[in-house]
Design a protein with these regions (language model features):
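Ordered, small/hydrophobic-rich secondary-structure cores
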Residues: 1-46
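A glycine-rich helix N-cap at a beta->alpha junction
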Residues: 56-60, 144-168
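Conserved mixed alpha/beta catalytic, RNA-binding, or beta-rich assembly cores of soluble enzyme
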Residues: 83-141
């Protein structure tokens, strides 16, 4: 009488199928999980997730739907159930309020997805610094504030550049984290494992 659970995410685009599967996996590490998706990108991403977690993954296609059945391997310790939050040694330097180059509109949508994925990720950065226009993401009316607050609640250090907040006239609107300066940020860039976005 193995515990079997179904995650039906047909009609959803990435990263939602992986996020929903991960939630069920975290809560039920011993269960056999069948995720149903209706596109190949989601199928591939859920399969990668299952294999990264040590599941045996079987895929069955029915029309345009894909059924991915993930069976836990008994010899693997179920991960995520009792372990403390894991922090990487990375510091993220956010330099603007959209991701990538080419299209700002696309970049703003990507940024929303980025913060959702960051909240769901197993390994968190130790700190996130915000400079230039990225400081707009940590003010009270930001669409990203809720997810960035979740990261702060999970122990990620959030710090925004004071000069930048002043420049955009939003210092009084800071909604999460602390105010820092370029000296501290430069110190971190020179001494820590920095990822610039």
């Amino acid at each position: 009488n193995t515990n079997e659970l179904t995650v039906d995410v047909r009609g959803s685009l990435c990263p939602k199928p992986v996020i929903e599967t991960k939630k069920v996996s975290d809560a039920n590490p011993d269960a056999v999980i069948t995720t149903i998706v209706d596109n190949e990108v989601s199928r591939d991403n859920v399969e990668k997730f299952g294999k990264s977690r040590g599941y045996g993954v079987a895929i069955r296609q029915d029309g345009k739907d894909f059924y991915l059945t993930m069976t836990p391997n008994d010899n693997l310790v179920a991960d995520g159930s009792c372990e403390p939050m894991s922090y990487g040694n990375r510091v993220i330097l956010m330099t603007k309020d959209y991701l990538g180059e080419g299209s700002e509109e696309l970049g703003r949508n990507l940024m929303k997805t980025f913060w959702v994925c960051m909240v769901e990720a197993d390994v968190k950065p130790s700190k996130i610094y915000f400079i230039n226009s990225s400081v707009k993401m940590v003010v009270n009316d930001s669409v990203h504030l809720e997810n960035i607050k979740k990261l702060a609640d999970l122990g990620v250090e959030i710090a925004a550049c004071g000069i930048c907040l002043d420049y955009f006239g939003v210092k009084e609107e800071l909604g999460v984290g602390s105010i820092t300066n370029m000296y501290a940020i430069t110190d971190s860039i020179l001494g820590e494992n920095i990822v610039k976005l």
